[in-house]
């Protein structure tokens, strides 16, 4: 996962406070501040503080400081970071040496009169090391370039923003870098039949979903159906674009990092994936889970000679997504229609994909 931090270059305390507020509003997780401003920043909101003080959440030192400070910080459960200005080849060597110390979690690299080459060298040298490489930049374009260097890119970026608009752009960039695209295909509907009542799960999120967006749900790990959000206008009830009526408690849902959970395990504060008709994803936070007894439909579809199944509530407002990317109500499903699925050859063990033979029916 890529991450981003903010650092203000202003000498005015009120402007630095505004930068903290802008960061909070844009969901930036951490900010670099002066040690005498830590208490002030904590009063403004909940954000990780990076500073040259043991009172910070991430303790920061420079090349000139005694690294033993970081040992003490690590012993007390703090995260640690070294800020290095790269001006010479010796600075590059120092950066790679410090990164191999077991009490250093992050290095921040600031370049003088360079952008890419030294970063490439350091990323390549530390490719297999357990260190987070962070680049300091002055604009969002340079942030994007840093994230993409040598395909792997830096783990994080510190942006010195000009204004709130740049902070917001930076936040959007981070989100886009962390999108997980999934490969969707279509399966052919073979059977739809009522199966009685059961405990059905509605996922109410903290995000507004658009037409073409939903979540990947299924009874089997090897094939999940794209269940559409309740964002479609209908004559029966008001839209609920924050909601996916997902199915019964037993079903799987695809979550970030290609993990699955049972619908029954979800709760407020958990993160799940919103997926659109093109396979593009974004994370969202669950605000509420509603489990209620409702009439259910069994849906069977064929993919590459195998039968995939899921169970959904029997209601007009519950929709899958056609192979053309259009929402289609479960009451309108017929044999021969094509719907979007995510096929998967892996089995699941505690939600993690494993290469193991498994029979699901």
Curated annotation (Swiss-Prot):
InterPro entries for this protein: DHQ_synth (IPR002812)
One Pfam family it belongs to: DHQS
Catalytic activity, EC: 1.4.1.24
Superkingdom as given in the UniProt entry: Archaea
GO biological process, one term: aromatic amino acid family biosynthetic process
Top EC class, one word: oxidoreductase
Disulfide-linked positions: none
Keywords recorded for this protein, A-Z: Amino-acid biosynthesis, Aromatic amino acid biosynthesis, NAD, Oxidoreductase
Reaction(s) the record says it catalyses: 2-amino-2,3,7-trideoxy-D-lyxo-hept-6-ulosonate + NAD(+) + H2O = 3-dehydroquinate + NH4(+) + NADH + H(+)
Gene Ontology molecular function: 3-dehydroquinate synthase activity; dehydroquinate synthase activity; NAD binding
Record's keyword annotation contains Amino-acid biosynthesis: yes
HAMAP family linked to this entry: Arch_DHQ_synthase
NCBIfam families the record matches: PRK02290.1-2
Function comment: Catalyzes the oxidative deamination and cyclization of 2-amino-3,7-dideoxy-D-threo-hept-6-ulosonic acid (ADH) to yield 3-dehydroquinate (DHQ), which is fed into the canonical shikimic pathway of aromatic amino acid biosynthesis.
Family of the protein in this entry: Belongs to the archaeal-type DHQ synthase family.
Name the record gives this protein: 3-dehydroquinate synthase
Source organism per UniProt: Methanococcus vannielii (strain ATCC 35089 / DSM 1224 / JCM 13029 / OCM 148 / SB)
Name of the coding gene: aroB'
């Amino acid at each position: 996962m890529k991450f981003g931090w903010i650092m203000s270059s202003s000498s005015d305390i009120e402007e630095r406070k505004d930068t903290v507020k802008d960061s909070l509003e844009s969901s930036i997780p951490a900010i670099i501040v002066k040690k005498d401003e830590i208490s002030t920043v904590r009063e403004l909101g909940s954000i990780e503080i990076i500073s040259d003080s043991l009172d910070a959440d991430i303790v920061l030192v420079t090349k000139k400081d005694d690294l033993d400070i970081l040992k003490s910080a690590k012993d007390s459960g703090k995260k640690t970071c070294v800020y290095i200005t790269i001006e010479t080849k010796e600075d590059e060597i120092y950066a790679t040496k410090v990164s191999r110390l077991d009490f250093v979690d992050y290095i921040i690299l600031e370049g003088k009169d360079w952008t890419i080459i030294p970063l490439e060298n350091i990323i390549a040298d530390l490719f297999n090391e357990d260190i987070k490489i962070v680049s300091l930049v002055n604009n969002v374009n340079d942030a994007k370039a840093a994230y993409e260097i040598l395909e792997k890119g830096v783990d994080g970026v510190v942006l010195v923003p000009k204004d709130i608009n740049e902070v917001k752009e930076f936040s959007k960039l981070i989100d886009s870098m962390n999108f997980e695209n999934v490969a969707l295909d279509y399966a052919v509907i073979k059977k739809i039949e009522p199966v009685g009542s059961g405990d059905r799960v509605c996922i109410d999120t903290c995000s507004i979903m658009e037409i073409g967006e939903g979540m990947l749900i299924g009874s089997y790990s090897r094939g999940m159906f794209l269940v559409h959000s309740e964002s479609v206008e209908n004559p029966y009830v008001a839209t609920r674009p924050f909601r996916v009526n997902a199915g019964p408690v037993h079903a799987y849902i695809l979550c970030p990092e290609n993990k699955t959970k049972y619908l029954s395990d979800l709760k407020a504060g958990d993160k799940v994936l919103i997926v659109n008709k093109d396979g593009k994803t974004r994370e969202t936070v669950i605000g509420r889970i509603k489990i209620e007894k409702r009439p259910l439909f069994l849906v069977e579809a064929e993919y590459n000679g195998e039968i995939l199944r899921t169970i959904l509530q029997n209601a007009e407002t519950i929709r899958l997504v056609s192979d053309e990317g259009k929402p289609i109500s479960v009451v309108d499903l017929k044999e021969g229609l094509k719907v979007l699925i995510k096929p998967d050859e892996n089995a699941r063990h505690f939600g993690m994909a494993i290469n193991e033979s498994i029979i699901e029916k």
